[in-house]
């Protein structure tokens, strides 16, 4: 009998082992759909971004006009732009849910997969930040100024580092040019990191909602999970297209409809919604360096998750106290997101400070403590 090409061809064999004949736990829920949704988000963003880059001019005098031209004169340019801008929001919704699922079900115990995942998150955040600067509106310009300026808080080399990043003494043409170059490069880095992420994942295989070994009950990825993923794609593209067609500016900032003006500061500088939780933590500390360290810690704290896992059970499925703590953390993140969008005045300042303390306390103190308590209650 002739060998099956899918199983013998050097390239097809890799695809087959990752997407077709991959043994998959039979009980993984819809929470396991977000990995493939992130993949489809990345592909959509690269495609729409490539089409937008063909009509974009990375120059301070022309950037804003070139985007207006894309939306008005290019065939379906408005749609491509709206899909790209709102696609970023969906990318972050998916990645936050993906991380939440990993945290809830103890997937961070696959250390390499978890760590590459955090690197992916950081790269995605960098990509979204430099991308937000490209339209060269008011919020683009001032957002870039405020956030890049934070590097000046680094002792001794800070100021030099900022001027080196800017390519001058303020955010100007060189900054825009290099940000465009970075925004083009980083998604391909994300694609490369994704392959590493998947390689590490397939070393151990997927986790499952029970957090137990599933070798005794595996099913092939295709057709079961390919079909399930296609359903996921449909359920994501529906709200994305609805948002892009009916309310494309809902998640943006009205300030960005005004071309960048270095002489006029917007009344309230704030990033896109997906950075607001970190922005709230940054603002809650009255010291510049302290704020920057807290901002970095808000994401880098995820690296500690495997070390802080004290429970004898992997998932939170059968741990009601830890579940309560998890949902408290989720609520706390919503509060931080809301605070980040508010002006710096009473009572928002104190709420932000309390929410920031709570965020780190839950992750670093309460989770390990409650896990140890649950072990004791279960006589482990």
Swiss-Prot record:
The organism's taxonomic lineage, starting at the top: Eukaryota, Metazoa, Chordata, Craniata, Vertebrata
Protein origin, superkingdom: Eukaryota
Name the record gives this protein: Cytochrome b
Requisite cofactors: heme b
CDD domains cross-referenced by the UniProt entry: cytochrome_b_C (cd00290), Cytochrome_b_N (cd00284)
First-listed, main subcellular location of the protein, grouped into a coarse class: mitochondrion
Native source species: Thalassarche impavida
Transmembrane annotation, as ranges: 34-54, 78-99, 114-134, 179-199, 227-247, 289-309, 321-341, 348-368
GO molecular function: metal ion binding; ubiquinol-cytochrome-c reductase activity
């Amino acid at each position: 009998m002739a060998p099956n090409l899918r199983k013998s061809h050097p390239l097809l064999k890799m695809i087959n082992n990752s997407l077709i004949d991959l043994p998959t736990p039979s009980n993984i829920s819809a929470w396991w759909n977000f990995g493939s949704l992130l993949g489809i988000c990345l592909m959509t963003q690269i495609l729409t971004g490539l089409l937008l880059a063909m009509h974009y001019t990375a120059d301070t005098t022309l950037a804003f006009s070139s985007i207006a031209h894309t939306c008005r004169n290019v065939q379906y340019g408005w749609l491509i732009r709206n899909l790209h801008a709102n696609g970023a929001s969906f990318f972050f919704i998916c990645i936050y849910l993906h991380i939440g699922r990993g945290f809830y079900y103890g997937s961070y115990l696959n250390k390499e997969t978890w760590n590459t995942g955090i690197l992916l998150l950081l790269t995605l955040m960098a990509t979204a930040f430099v991308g937000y600067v490209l339209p060269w509106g008011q919020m683009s310009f001032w957002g870039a100024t405020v956030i890049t300026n934070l590097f000046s808080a680094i002792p001794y080399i800070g100021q030099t580092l900022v001027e080196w990043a800017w390519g001058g003494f303020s955010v100007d043409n060189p900054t825009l040019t290099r940000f465009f170059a970075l925004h083009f490069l980083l998604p391909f880095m994300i694609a490369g990191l994704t392959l590493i992420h998947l390689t590490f994942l397939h070393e151990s295989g997927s986790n499952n909602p029970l957090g137990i070994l599933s070798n005794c009950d595996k099913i092939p990825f295709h057709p079961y999970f390919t079909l399930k993923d296609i359903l996921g794609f449909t359920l994501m593209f529906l709200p994305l297209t609805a948002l892009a067609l009916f309310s494309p500016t809902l998640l943006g900032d009205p300030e960005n409809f005004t071309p960048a003006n270095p002489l006029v500061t917007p009344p309230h500088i704030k990033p896109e919604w997906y950075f607001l939780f970190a922005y709230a933590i940054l603002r809650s500390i009255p010291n510049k360096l302290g704020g920057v360290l807290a901002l970095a810690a808000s994401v880098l704290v995820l690296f500690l998750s495997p070390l802080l896992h004290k429970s004898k059970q992997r998932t939170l499925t059968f741990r009601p106290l830890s579940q309560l703590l998890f949902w408290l953390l989720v609520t706390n993140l919503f509060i931080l997101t809301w605070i980040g969008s508010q002006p710096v005045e009473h009572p928002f300042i104190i709420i932000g400070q309390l929410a920031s303390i709570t965020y780190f306390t839950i992750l670093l103190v309460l989770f390990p403590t409650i896990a140890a308590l649950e072990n004791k209650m279960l006589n482990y």
